[in-house]
């Protein structure tokens, strides 16, 4: 029986740029860093990992990592204050979450959410 997700690993063409992005969002590095080939961030009780890939390696898939945050609007304000953009402001969804989406520098879609009520 599956208990939980331990980690999500995303590829990056520029580790320094990706590390800067995720640190600006408040992710804490637990391994690696801007000069590494592999970096791991704490994401609650799980981990978000980055693995460096050569620029000639391309990916053409779609997926989304969803992270629960304590305050969606405050998190969004921090994203904007750090110079990043989201296609739309946080909103309440019919499935019972407040959320917004953000795309990282390598094109990975992220969602930051919180259950309503």
Q: Which functions belong to the PLM regions below?
A:
Residues 9, 28-34, 91-93, 117:
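Conserved catalytic-core motifs of GNAT/GCN5-like acyltransferases
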Residues 28-62, 109-114:
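Conserved short beta-strand elements that form part of the metal-binding/catalytic scaffold
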């Amino acid at each position: 029986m599956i208990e939980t997700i331990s980690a999500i690993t995303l590829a990056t063409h520029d580790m320094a740029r990706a590390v800067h992005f995720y640190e600006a969002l408040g992710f804490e590095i637990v391994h690696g860093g801007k000069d590494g080939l592999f970096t791991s961030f704490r994401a609650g009780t799980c981990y978000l990992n980055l693995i460096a890939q050569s620029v000639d390696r391309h990916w053409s898939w779609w997926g989304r990592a969803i992270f629960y945050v304590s305050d969606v609007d405050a998190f969004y304000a921090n994203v904007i204050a750090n110079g990043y953009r989201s296609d739309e402001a946080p909103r309440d969804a019919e499935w019972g979450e407040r959320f917004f989406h953000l795309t990282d520098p390598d094109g990975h879609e992220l969602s930051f959410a919180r259950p309503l009520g």
